[in-house]
């Protein structure tokens, strides 16, 4: 049965349009779009997009309440970034390459830290008045923003991330000491956790269940500088409204006082000490420069790389 002339004309036009060059061009464009995340300059776009959102779009000179609407401290709240694993970021085993974990962490942790600490890092967001630990200093104002620097990072890989797999990066402040603020991050399977951080379906808080959804766990530490002087994290936390100024407990602004657990300095200190148990092991790596053994160990070989 012969096809109508209009259909034959259409098929002929389509066939004439499809050429090897056009097929290759289309495949190349599709490949680039599929792997856009790993292309040169995209990391910078992702980073500055987060900075723009926190420092410009969400600019505010008034710190948010100490607790959220459910009475939980904002300091320990997670910041979540949804990601994917393009083929260009895979290694020869077709798993997410080790180095690319850190580029995702850069984006996620930067926005987390800017969300928490923009009131001391950005001139436009600095409060007009700054309170100190004893509640005084109402007429004070920070003259210039602080500088924040990363002082170390580590990552443990638990499960492979396959090509094009979707996942989420969850980061929060774990603890702080006299110098460092420690941030813990988790790569988790997309859809394993609800928006409020609870497990979905039959999952619970059992550590064995956690291991099934946690793909990687990471830790980093940050220091705040005023010129060359290190600023104690507790002071920074208080200026940003993340740590109580007085001993009395406080309740969430929108929550009923009778139904919300109180959080004061004692509760924050208890959580901090618990986090320092893990963070202290990370800081224990400070001794590594003393264990080089350069004068005692031989050299297997030397080669030039890019």
Swiss-Prot record:
InterPro entries in the cross-refs: HotDog_dom_sf, THEM6_lcsJ_thioesterase
UniProtKB keywords: Transferase
Keyword Ribosomal protein attributed: no
Enzyme class: transferase
Protein name: Probable thioesterase atnL
Domain of life: Eukaryota
The enzyme's E.C. designation: 2.3.1.-
Entry's induction text: Expression is positively regulated by the aspercryptin cluser-specific transcription factor atnN.
GO molecular function: transferase activity
Pfam families for the chain: 4HBT_2
Family assignment from sequence similarity: Belongs to the lcsJ thioesterase family.
Disruption phenotype: Does not alter the yield of aspercryptin significantly.
PANTHER family: PROTEIN THEM6, PTHR12475
Its biological purpose: Part of the gene cluster that mediates the biosynthesis of aspercryptins, linear lipopeptides built from six amino acids including 2 highly unusual and nonproteogenic amino acids, 2-amino-octanoic acid (2aoa) and 2-amino-dodecanol (2adol). The core structure of aspercryptins is as follows: Ser/Ala-Thr-Ile/Val-2aoa-Asn-2adol. The first step of aspercryptin biosynthesis is the generation of the fatty acid precursors, octanoic and dodecanoic acids, by the FAS subunits atnF and atnM. The fatty acid precursors are likely transformed into the corresponding alpha-amino fatty acids in three steps.
Keyword Cell membrane: no
Listed SUPFAM superfamilies: Thioesterase/thiol ester dehydrase-isomerase (SSF54637)
């Amino acid at each position: 049965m012969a096809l109508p002339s209009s259909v034959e004309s259409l098929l002929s036009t389509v066939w004439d349009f499809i050429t090897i060059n056009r097929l290759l061009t289309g495949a190349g464009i599709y490949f680039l779009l599929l792997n856009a995340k790993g292309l040169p300059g995209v990391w910078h776009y992702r980073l500055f997009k987060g900075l723009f959102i926190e420092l410009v779009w969400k600019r505010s000179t008034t710190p948010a309440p100490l607790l959220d609407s459910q009475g939980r401290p904002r300091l320990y709240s997670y910041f979540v970034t949804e990601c994917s694993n393009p083929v260009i970021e895979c290694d020869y085993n077709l798993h997410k390459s080790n180095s690319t974990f850190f580029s995702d962490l850069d984006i996620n942790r930067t926005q987390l830290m800017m969300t928490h600490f923009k009131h001391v890092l950005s001139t436009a967001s600095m409060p007009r008045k700054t309170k100190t630990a004893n509640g005084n200093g109402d007429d004070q104002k920070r003259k210039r923003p602080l500088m924040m620097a990363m002082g170390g990072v580590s990552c443990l890989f638990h499960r492979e991330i396959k090509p094009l797999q979707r996942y989420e990066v969850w980061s929060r402040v774990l603890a702080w000491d006299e110098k460092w603020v420690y941030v813990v991050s988790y790569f988790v399977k997309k859809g394993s956790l609800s928006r409020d951080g609870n497990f979905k379906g039959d999952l619970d808080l059992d550590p064995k269940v956690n291991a099934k959804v946690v793909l990687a766990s990471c830790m980093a530490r940050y220091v705040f500088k005023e010129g060359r002087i290190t600023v104690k994290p507790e002071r920074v936390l208080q200026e940003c409204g993340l740590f109580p100024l007085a001993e009395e407990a406080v309740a969430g602004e929108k929550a009923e006082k009778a139904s919300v657990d109180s959080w004061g300095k004692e509760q924050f200190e208890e959580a901090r000490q618990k986090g320092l148990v893990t963070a202290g092991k990370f800081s224990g790596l400070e001794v590594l420069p003393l264990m080089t053994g350069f004068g005692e160990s031989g050299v297997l070989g030397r080669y030039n790389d890019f």
